[in-house]
């Protein structure tokens, strides 16, 4: 068993105010590797800004500005996350969803559509 030692005890993360998390399954079950760069950036942003129910209200204009993403890349990324069952969107509000039981798209397939 690996013994863990805190590298910098003065800078240990603590939960203060808002807090978000990404389940370990996001990495180990291949969800992360199924996303292209824009999808991953948008997903991480939505996780970081969402409330405890996974809801966020950022407009597409604000998201594109903050992520330095074109409207086209944003729309493709949003649609990709919806198709992979990671988020829901009603035109105004985003919801980051609990991870599905399995990937809807094989990890290698997601990377085929990455922007140039």
What do these predicted ranges mean?
Residues 49-102:
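Winged helix-turn-helix DNA-binding recognition segment
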Residues 5-6, 11, 98, 108-111:
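Acidic/proline-rich low-complexity IDRs
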Residues 24, 33, 65, 76, ...:
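Charged/polar, solvent-exposed surface patches and flexible loops
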């Amino acid at each position: 068993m690996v013994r863990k030692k805190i590298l910098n005890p003065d800078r240990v993360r603590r939960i203060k105010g808002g807090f978000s998390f990404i389940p370990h399954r996001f990495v180990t079950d291949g969800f992360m590797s199924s996303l292209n760069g824009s999808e991953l950036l948008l997903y991480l942003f939505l996780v970081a800004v969402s409330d405890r129910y996974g809801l966020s209200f950022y407009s597409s204009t604000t998201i594109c500005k903050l992520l330095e993403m074109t409207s086209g890349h944003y729309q493709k990324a949003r649609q990709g996350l919806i198709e992979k069952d990671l988020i829901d969107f009603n035109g105004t509000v985003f919801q980051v969803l609990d991870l599905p039981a399995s990937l809807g798209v094989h990890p290698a397939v997601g990377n085929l559509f990455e922007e140039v």
